[in-house]
């Protein structure tokens, strides 16, 4: 009799975006760093991402975060992010969900009040601040990746739409930033399908026209994200609010505004001279959920003004599950998956 192969999941969401935290069922991956382990998954074991983001187990609108042992002793755990577009090296919402999961799983014991710890992402170490009240994780603040404007106020002709003005920011991935009003959008939930169609056309046009290179990372692949920007409202001194929507290519409008989308907005506001260190931007999604981004400092790296920032949000645990992986099931594609499945009991990442 074949051993039953299972994967242990803790499903969470932040702002409506579901992050599936893989807590067990996967063998240790080769690689001396979390980044190297991510590259192994991407190149040799992409079946895990496909399994959990496609039917019958999942849908493309979800994300997956695989917990792995940290390779840096300062971190409590490592994590690898998987989305419909592939393997982003960082994500604010996924980091908030992963931080909540390691607290709920006891990998990092909860402490009342504020507590601090580190996680190791493919982009490197991430400082986490969690606020716990009566045993509940009420908020998580994580560092956003240093963010900058790569291209400002460019224009492209998009088939079926016309001329579209856009800027490009890097905040963990390259984002096209477009003004929603100029395209006729109020960023309400009933516009979701048309937002996805419009964003798909714009991203396809930009990808066909040009590529983008990070000033230290080099080529990080074609532009995968677009962020629709609503008008910014000044709520109080140093505090702004804006309706927003983030698109992930191909075809997904995120339920939340996303952490990296919020970081990209902070980079643009700094570039235009409209924000100072200590100022905050609350981005509000189609579903009226949101994140708060804080602009902390700015540094000059070559030709770029690089914005240091943090993202605050709340994650909820919505399910604990063991999924059974049966490679004889015609609906299940075990290519790029079977060799990393483990029949072991779930194990916590080493601390």
Swiss-Prot record:
Pfam family, one: Pro_racemase
Gene3D superfamilies referenced in this protein's UniProt entry, alphabetically: Diaminopimelate Epimerase, Chain A, domain 1
SUPFAM superfamilies the UniProt entry points to: Diaminopimelate epimerase-like
Membrane spanning stretches: none
Domain of life of the source: Bacteria
Signal peptide: none
One GO MF term attached to the UniProt entry: 4-hydroxyproline epimerase activity
Functional note: Displays neither proline racemase activity nor trans-4-hydroxy-L-proline (t4LHyp) epimerase activity nor t3LHyp dehydratase activity.
Family stated for the protein in its record: Belongs to the proline racemase family.
Protein name: Protein Maqu_2141
Organism whose genome encodes this protein: Marinobacter nauticus (strain ATCC 700491 / DSM 11845 / VT8)
